Swiss-Prot record:
Full protein name: Elongation factor Tu
Record domain tr-type G: where: 1-185
Residues annotated to bind GTP: 1-7, 62-66, 117-120
Binding site for Mg(2+): T7
The EC number(s) this enzyme carries: 3.6.5.3
Gene Ontology cellular component annotations, sorted alphabetically: cytosol
Lineage, broadest ranks: Bacteria, Pseudomonadati, Pseudomonadota, Gammaproteobacteria, Enterobacterales
Name of a matching Pfam family: GTP_EFTU_D2
Gene name in the database record: tuf
InterPro entries, alphabetized: EF-Tu_GTP-bd, EF-Tu_GTPase, EFTu-like_2, EFTU_2, G_TR_CS, P-loop_NTPase, T_Tr_GTP-bd_dom, Transl_B-barrel_sf
Amino acid sequence: HVDHGKTTLTAAITTVLAKKYGGSARAFDQIDNAPEEKARGITINTSHVEYDTSMRHYAHVDCPGHADYIKNMITGAAQMDGAILVVAATDGPMPQTREHILLGRQVGVPYIVVFLNKCDMVDDEELLELVEMEVRDLLTQYDFPGEKTPIIRGSALKALEGDAVWEEKIVDLANTLDSYIPTPERSIDQPFLLPIEDVFSISGRGTVVTGRVERGVIKVGEEVEIVGIKVTSKTICTGVEMFRKLLDEGRAGENVGVLLRGTKRDDIERGQVLAKPGTITPHIKFESEVYVLSKEEGGRHTPFFKGYRPQFYFRTTDVTGYVELPEGVEMVMPGDNIKMVVTLIHPIAMSDGLRFAIREGGRTV
């Protein structure tokens, strides 16, 4: 929340940790004048900083405005592994604090650590305990483990000014991030998934699908499922090739061709995925968080209403679907963010947190 000290804290973290573990400090004004970014055509003000702790290297995002966080999280390719919620001890939780926690819940931030800022300005221990209790209650309301959530008491400004007592609290915060937020699973260790981009028949050998392996590893001889658009089917991978070379396996990040046993060219199409059996399911109806582009961002000039039928672009393909709006919402204006329920005309392989774009006549909405 504005003036609770998010940006000062970001500057303090980079400064204190650079002193202790190396790396570069970032001044407040370097972070505060967040450059405008164009992510998928959406204008977002955001500052990216990086820092090292004793155990890890962190990438950290600081956004000036609430709307910027929403846009950042909806469009961001990177999943947030955790968040630092900054609350000023002098004010306690404000309406924006609740919004930030709700936002974390909506976009699937798995872990929150609380930094209670400006504690140098509060002498009253009981007041600090009261603020902590209020924050814990709020977290619990939104299904975060309020009782277990670590709360670090500190002063970002004093730490930034080099006061050793408060610098130590920044180190405490860093240690807490290391211990409380689990190390995310690398994409190579996750179950195999390949969004299909193209399908070929190779006479005498069968059908080859091509695409970039999104996660995991596919080995020759393994069983795979073909999921989405049609009824889910199973087959065996009989070959993997990359740049015309035959390989034993295809790994996350690689563009490969996968040869499939006994699968006909017409059984399979772009927009389906190849996956490790049982790891992803097809769905027609889903709940989503959507940011609607403003006119300036190249979006619509007019609102849309329930029953709107655009195209929904998932991974490699467009599918038509229709929109249901929340109760009491009549229309959606360009620039809004909205929770909507969508029903597609074909099933698509989906899991929680999957990103998609809404398009109309070839342009993004």
